Design a protein with these regions (language model features):
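Extended catalytic cores of very large enzyme megasubunits
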Residues: 1-143
Length: 143
């Protein structure tokens, strides 16, 4: 992940260097809490569920520019998503607070964003839409 935060591309101009810096800082904060066991992390979130593991590998774990997976468990995804979302808060204390809350909610299954958010939030290598569905107004229905 360190290489991803150093990567310079479209994300710099769209997300903004300050937001990326905030994101990296919060990501490292959540990592330290995982390491201290202050936040839940055991690396076995999926147990031995092969189907769930394959889904995470194919859809949700982000890949580097060489197409190599750089996340290894759902807790990595929770860390990335919670850090990226919380980085938009207005102060460092709020960013940390909300990243921790988002992480716990994701881990406990209280909050589950759509697949596009899981796949794209915080991926600095590739810009992806975070919108899961689009709604179009139907002017006239004759059914």
């Amino acid at each position: 992940m360190e290489a991803m935060f150093k990567h310079r591309g479209k994300a710099d101009s769209i997300i903004g260097k300050k937001n990326i810096s905030n994101y990296e800082s919060i990501y490292n904060h959540i990592s330290s809490l995982q390491n201290k066991k202050t936040l839940p992390f055991d690396g076995k979130y999926l147990s031995d569920n092969e189907l769930a593991s394959n889904i995470y590998k194919k859809k949700y774990y982000i890949k580097d520019l060489n197409n190599q997976i750089i996340e290894s468990c759902p807790e990595d995804v929770f860390k990335r998503v919670s850090s990226f979302i919380a980085a938009s808060e207005t102060s460092t204390s709020k960013q940390k607070k909300w990243a921790e809350i988002f992480y716990k909610d994701l881990y406990n299954g209280y909050f589950l964003p759509g697949g596009r958010v899981f796949a794209g939030a915080g991926d600095i290598y590739r810009l992806k839409t975070l919108a899961n569905c689009f709604v179009s107004k139907i002017e006239k229905d004759e059914i």
